[in-house]
A protein has these predicted regions:
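His/acidic metal-ligating clusters that form di-metal
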Residues: 1-70
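Binuclear metal-dependent phosphoesterase catalytic core
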Residues: 43, 65-118
């Protein structure tokens, strides 16, 4: 990853990953986050081009700021997670719409959309 970030030194970089490196505030999901997240952030802090982090695994749309980095997640096209902050296990939502994200890239700009599906 370091080599690729170095090669993209003059570009804005959006990093995609399955497990989030950031905490979500949802205890059960935070237990499943990237195991070496400290190493991950130590690595990307050496570069000024990382602009946004996008991850899966959460099965909920959310965005925020963590360690100085903007992040986004999207709903799943399959099943959603119940929004519980103090749960020790993941629980699937019943009857909640599926969804997905669309990222429009336009040169050095980007826009992130969230779309729900019945």
């Amino acid at each position: 990853m370091s080599q690729k970030l170095k090669e993209a030194d003059h570009e804005k970089v959006i990093l995609f990953m399955h497990h989030p490196a950031f905490t979500t505030g949802m205890q059960a999901m935070d237990l499943l986050r990237l195991k070496n997240s400290h190493d991950f952030f130590s690595t990307i802090k050496n570069f000024n081009n990382v602009n946004h982090l996008i991850s899966g695994h959460i099965h909920r749309s959310m965005c925020g700021l963590y360690e100085g980095y903007n992040f986004s997640t999207f709903k799943s096209i399959n099943q959603q997670m119940v929004l519980k902050f103090k749960a020790d296990r993941v629980e699937y939502a019943k009857g909640e719409n599926s969804g997905y994200g669309i990222i429009l890239l336009d040169g050095k700009n980007y826009t992130i959309h969230n779309e729900e599906v019945n």
